[in-house]
Amino acid sequence: MGLPWYRVHTVVLNDPGRLIAVHIMHTALVSGWAGSMALYELAVFDPSDPILDPMWRQGMFVIPFMTRLGIKDSWGGWSITGETGSNPGIWSYEGVAGAHIVFSGLCFLAAIWHWVYWDLDVFCDSRTGKPSLDLPKIFGIHLFLSGAACFGFGAFHVTGLYGPGIWVSDPYGLTGKIQPVNPAWGAEGFDPFVPGGIASHHIAAGILGILAGLFHLSVRPPQRLYKGLRMGNIETVLSSSIAAVFFAAFIVAGTMWYGSATTPIELFGPTRYQWDQGYFQQEIDRRVRAGLAENLSLSEAWSKIPEKLAFYDYIGNNPAKGGLFRAGAMDNGDGIAVGWLGHPIFKDKNGHELFVRRMPTFFETFPVVLVDEEGIVKADVPFRRAESKYSVEQVGVTVEFYGGELDGVSFGDPAIVKKYARRAQLGEIFELDRATLKSDGVFRSSPRGWFTFGHATFALLFFFGHIWHGARTLFRDVFAGIDPDLDAQVEFGAFQKLGDPTTKRQVV
């Protein structure tokens, strides 16, 4: 019988051999994409400036995931940390990409083999000779194997016992490096920003998975539960698998968008909440005050601020500033950052310090307003000059830079002061090269934004898929008129559909 496009997957419904084949082919496609994408990113990635042009500014998507798992060197002689001439051995970025492509090829061949040799003895019950799969037993096997892999990752790879460790950094994303991590078994292990929780949770979840797998291998489900949850129906497996996947997708969308130890800002860029809360601005202010307390001059205190920290405190690195349909890397938007101009301090003609009010995340334009330390408006760039009372010219605002390339330089020309006031709305001021990439000046999101949007969207779609297939398997007799206890293999390509005269409906 002919199948409409949206029902073509039913051809593998009662065909375990070809069900395996299509899943292996899917793995081949996923692995092949990952390896190919890694090679493409490596071809276009510029590792020369890890401070002002890091991977996330360049739109790298798979390189950050390799890096957080312990890969940091290239066969090209560069390292993500800025070192040169290192010898990474086989596990370089290119080595990982090549391994994925080789694995993809092997999966491709295995998929073809399983498609051709689909009617294997292992799929038949030796006592009856009828096709049958022991799905609870298969569940136990998969649970045991995934538990073992989970435990191995936490106990060996993350801890450095047999592996490199993972990417660990400080709260401000300045000192990140690959290092072994000790498991955190106390309450701190539940803090999403504590790397030790990654090790301890993988170890604990792995042990639980191994024990649960052994349980399901050794204990049969009660008949009432087996029938009630349709454990003999492969669509039950599909439904529960989709549930696991959409749940995981929602979780990682959250850990990516809100930030966690698994999504370091050095690899994926800052989160929008760090801009909203003035996170880096407060740390910079704390460091400057500490410098002044040590009798440093204002210029010396600002000059000690790491350029990396200042760059985080710039709205162009906020992943929520890029529209969902603005394709391309951050560098294609506001340009490639070249250097920090320094911190501008504005003063009125009486010498009182003024502060530019920063632009909130969801504004494209925002009035230029300068306030005093009590938050009272003292100067602005007016929309209507005729009614202006607080214009830069009237208030006599000047600006002087501390730290950065313009350290010690001051400006009194109102046009220049207004230019830097507008730029100070966006955080620390950087020189940006828009010519090299023909950047259009419109902000882009970082890989953090793309990952979150993609996973949240697919999680929602998969949630509906879980409901759909769960309902189909639980109410198969209602929807298709097929006895739920029917376990006979039916004609190839004609499965369990309403109005299909070839599908057997009753057990007897």
Curated annotation (Swiss-Prot):
Gene3D superfamilies of this UniProt entry?
Photosystem II CP47 reaction center protein (3.10.680.10)
Per the record, the GO terms for biological process are: photosynthetic electron transport in photosystem II
**GO CC annotations?**
chloroplast thylakoid membrane; photosystem II
**What Pfam family is a match for this entry?**
PSII
State the free-text cofactor note: Binds multiple chlorophylls. PSII binds additional chlorophylls, carotenoids and specific lipids.
Q: Which residues cross the membrane?
A: 21-36, 101-115, 140-156, 203-218, 237-252, 457-472
Which keywords fit this entry according to its UniProt record?
Chlorophyll, Chloroplast, Chromophore, Membrane, Photosynthesis, Photosystem II, Plastid, Thylakoid, Transmembrane, Transmembrane helix
InterPro entries in alphabetical order:
PS_antenna-like, PS_II_antenna-like_sf, PSII_PsbB
Give the primary localization class.
Answer: plastid
Q: Which domain of life does the protein's organism represent?
A: Eukaryota
Compartment list: Plastid, Chloroplast thylakoid membrane
Membrane topology category: Multi-pass membrane protein
One GO term in the molecular function aspect is:
electron transporter, transferring electrons within the cyclic electron transport pathway of photosynthesis activity
- HAMAP family hit by this protein: PSII_PsbB_CP47
Q: What does this protein do?
A: One of the components of the core complex of photosystem II (PSII). It binds chlorophyll and helps catalyze the primary light-induced photochemical processes of PSII. PSII is a light-driven water:plastoquinone oxidoreductase, using light energy to abstract electrons from H(2)O, generating O(2) and a proton gradient subsequently used for ATP formation.
UniProt similarity note: Belongs to the PsbB/PsbC family. PsbB subfamily.
Describe, as the record does, how this protein assembles with itself and its partners: PSII is composed of 1 copy each of membrane proteins PsbA, PsbB, PsbC, PsbD, PsbE, PsbF, PsbH, PsbI, PsbJ, PsbK, PsbL, PsbM, PsbT, PsbX, PsbY, PsbZ, Psb30/Ycf12, at least 3 peripheral proteins of the oxygen-evolving complex and a large number of cofactors. It forms dimeric complexes.
Protein name per its UniProtKB record: Photosystem II CP47 reaction center protein
